Curated annotation (Swiss-Prot):
Its cofactor is Zn(2+). Its EC number is 2.3.1.286. The active site is at H146 (proton acceptor). This is NAD-dependent protein deacetylase hst2-2. GO terms for cellular component: nucleus. InterPro entries: DHS-like_NAD/FAD-binding_dom, NAD-dep_sirtuin_deacylases, Sirtuin, Sirtuin_cat_small_dom_sf, Ssirtuin_cat_dom. The lineage of its organism: Eukaryota, Fungi, Dikarya, Ascomycota, Pezizomycotina. It catalyses: N(6)-acetyl-L-lysyl-[protein] + NAD(+) + H2O = 2''-O-acetyl-ADP-D-ribose + nicotinamide + L-lysyl-[protein]. It is found in: Nucleus.
């Protein structure tokens, strides 16, 4: 089974790379029925307009804001080995990035519109925010490669953890612990951290979708996390790839059939909709998704919680202060960090030796 691995500019104006294939020709093929099975691979850049910072953009990305936490390296925030010993940073970030704080953007609505038009084959999402589903994309057409917030369990005894207690933990930023007698293990949401296996069935689903796709749409991803980063490379060379992103990533742009739309994701997807004659319908679909999300938030009592939530930056500062008090002079914490860094270095050296 595949596992999640981490590998260690913003464009001022939207630009389209000049290849043989163009946006016009792609849209024409969709309109004439030549393209009927679009597979999408989406990353954090799809959700930036929803208020969720991506990870690697200098100055504004999540990793650029983590300095107060003094992590051994940015990805440690989402590494299972680090989480097992030091879960405080993760829950500080979770408090500021939980789905109750977010609403679908135009990009999420665009995916829902593709399905409505009958041309969406599947969505591989690296996001854990669930905004594709909130926008109306059918659950059976989405694979959350990095999991989601739908469930939670103890990492020690694997027992399920009450949803109401998890909501309280996220709201306060406190680490939740198992409620089973004599366990006291750390509780983790159903997200996939670095060092954990991807969802069961990923390999077979990837093979199935790439073998039947007639277009790959890559939106808002750095393609720096394997095995997701390999999806565009594994696509048959005759199938066009459309990149919607701030910058070029992977090897997209090297094939004559590639189309690279560089700039703001929402702006470009609106432009694609305009080329297809779907611009008014896209705005209508987006408006409907916002109404549904607001109603869902009210029904779950999330709207009040969202108003109470501090900013991401405030969550980070508070967590840093708490960690300094709790673990600043802990010899055990120092040994844990040294051991974790040793494991990380061993992984790097092993990869280099392959």
């Amino acid at each position: 089974m595949s596992s999640l691995r981490a590998h260690q500019k913003k464009n001022p104006t939207p630009t389209q790379c000049q290849n043989q294939t163009t946006l016009d020709s792609i849209c024409k093929d969709i309109q004439t029925g030549k393209i009927t099975r679009i597979v999408a691979l989406v990353g954090a850049g799809l959700s930036t307009s929803s208020g969720l910072a991506d990870f690697r953009t200098p100055d504004t990305g999540l990793y650029a804001k983590l300095e107060p936490l003094q992590l051994p390296y940015p990805e440690a925030l989402f590494h299972i080995s680090y989480f097992k010993h030091t879960p405080e940073p993760f829950y500080a970030i979770a408090r500021g990035r939980h789905p109750w704080n977010t609403k679908p953007g135009v990009g999420h609505a665009f995916l829902a519109l593709l399905e409505k038009k009958g041309v969406l084959g599947f969505v591989f999402t690296q996001n854990i925010d669930g905004l594709e589903l909130d926008a109306g994309v059918s659950r059976e057409r989405v694979m959350n490669l990095h999991g989601d917030w739908s469930d939670q369990h103890c990492i020690k005894c694997r027992s399920s953890y009450p949803a109401d207690r998890m909501r309280k933990a996220i709201l306060t930023g406190e680490v939740p612990f198992c409620v089973q007698a004599n366990c006291e293990g750390i509780v983790k949401p159903a997200i996939v951290m670095f060092g954990e296996s991807l969802p069961e069935g990923f390999d077979s689903r990837e093979e199935e979708m790439l073998s039947t796709a007639d277009l790959l749409l890559v939106i808002g991803t750095s393609l720096k996390v394997a095995p997701c980063s390999e999806i565009p490379r594994r696509l048959p060379s005759h199938v066009p790839r459309v990149l919607v992103n701030r910058e070029l990533v992977g090897n997209i742009g090297t094939r004559e059939s590639d189309v690279c739309l560089l700039g703001d994701c929402d702006a470009w997807l609106r432009e694609v909709a305009r080329h297809l004659g779907w611009d008014e319908e896209l705005e209508s679909v987006w408006k409907d998704t916002l109404v549904r999300k607001e109603k869902s938030s009210r029904d779950k009592g999330w709207d009040d919680k969202a108003e109470q939530s501090p900013t991401l930056e405030e969550c980070i500062v508070r967590a840093a202060e708490q960690m300094k008090v709790r673990m600043g002079v802990s010899e055990g914490h120092r040994r844990m960090l040294e051991g974790h860094l040793g494991e990380k270095m061993a992984e790097i050296m092993a990869k280099r030796g392959q």
